[in-house]
Amino acid sequence: MNQTFTFADRLKSAMEQKHMKQVDLIHAAETAGVKVGKSHISQYVSGKTVPRAEILHFLSETLDVDADWLSGNGGNAVNLETSPRRTFSKSTKLDNVLYDVRGPVVDEANRMERNGTHILKIKYREILLHLVYRTPDEVIYDMRHQLADCQGYSASQGLFAARKAIMQYAQLKKIPNVDIDDIYTGNGVSELINLSMSALLDDGDEILIPSPDYPLWTACATLAGGKAVHYICDEQSEWYPDMEDIKRKVNSRTKAIVLINPNNPTGALYPREVLQQIVDIAREHQLMIFSDEIYDRLVMDGEEHVSIASLAPDLFCVTFSGLSKSHMIAGFRIGWMILSGNKAIARDYIEGLNMLSNMRLCSNVPAQAVVQTALGGHQSVNDYIIPGGRIYEQREFIYNALCDIPGISAVKPKAAFYIFPKIDTKKFNITNDEQFALDLLREKKILIVHGSGFNWKDPDHFRVVYLPRVEVLKDASVKLRDFLEYYRQ
């Protein structure tokens, strides 16, 4: 029968349906960063007081009930004997999709920050790019100047001027057989990775992806219904791909191979002879090549970046790049992909790309408008990656500082702004690298990404972003050394 209940009655009923006790609500509040104590919950349950709006919202979210129902909605009668509310689960397509670069460790860091704790972040490239490095003035000026003309949609593949500039950049990289219709702009490379995987993979199709990888590749391949098969990059060989491992993992279901060059998270740069070996394997097994080259302008030590597409005019290649890293405009969301080589063998796939490109209408038009200026003007990033430049000097410092810590070793990166140190797991008795990252965060307030977040199979690595100034990196390395002096898992 219908009966009017107090707030306390409704709260207790909702707790019973969720099989939650007062202590469970307290733990949930701690996790969510909501300031509510044991005495508060006790008073709500006993009916001595009712919560303020913020706490009411937290309770309704935690208990999966409507906030208006929980508050009584002005005293309206509520029937507690009706069937439980319908709940909505995530799609089963996401069951095997992981993106731990922004996962539990980051959630814990966010909770700590909400509670007033300062976190030393040597993880977030996007935040650090914005806070530490300036976007070139001419890029900002151009966006402001053209903003009034960027209010409508562009062609789905992008503005002509932007694609023309990208095509000319592809020519400088010696990428063969590229015209204006082979260029697609996107809201960052991330959108285009998702689009390219969705257009290619059917259930059961396999795609070779490096380990360690940037996890979006694995996530997008899995979400598209494919199977990511990880080939090993060998730490003992400058993190270059292990060719024998690639050969072992190719089979009749393999459709493509992915390269990340320069590499995130290792900072490796693949020389021409390594790329040629991959081309030879792709040619033998008739594979498509996807090459993520977003860091191609962040190469140090006088090394040259070679685009693998320039070595494979007879294969179908898709090359990805953008302005987020080289021009410090991650928030502008502008990337591109370039189709090259033998496009005749991929006509149907290209039709799928066009369909998906049309479905999202177009990418960010104001950001497209600055591509021509960004690619054609002074490349200010060059000043950062030479001796005396900030990125160069910060790499030198963090590499030496990490290698000086007992139990830590690292391969010196040649490009990008990442280093992927190895931990002596026997020395520190580490069996769970995510727990290591959480313990470091809670003890020393340092945020890193654990190696398994990059689909690395062993719990013995972590990634550091060396974009902060040397004094910040020094503080972080001292705290890490202190932590490892006593840490045992």
Per-range role (PLM):
Residues 46-61, 77:
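Short, basic-rich loop-to-helix N-cap that marks the start of a DNA-contacting helix
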Residues 146-280, 297-310, 478-479:
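Conserved core of the PLP fold type I
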Residues 372, 388-402, 410-424:
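Conserved glycine-rich beta-strand-loop-beta hairpin in the small C-terminal domain of fold type I
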Residues 172, 429-431, 439-448, 454-489:
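PLP-dependent enzyme catalytic core of the Aspartate aminotransferase-like
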Residues 1-27:
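A short, Lys/Arg-rich alpha-helix, primarily the initiator
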Residues 95-188, 195, 362, 374-377, ...:
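N-terminal small-domain helix-loop-helix segment of the aminotransferase-like
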Residues 310-389, 399-401, 484:
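Conserved core segment of the aminotransferase class I/II
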Residues 31-51, 72-73:
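Recognition helix of helix-turn-helix/homeodomain-like DNA-binding domains
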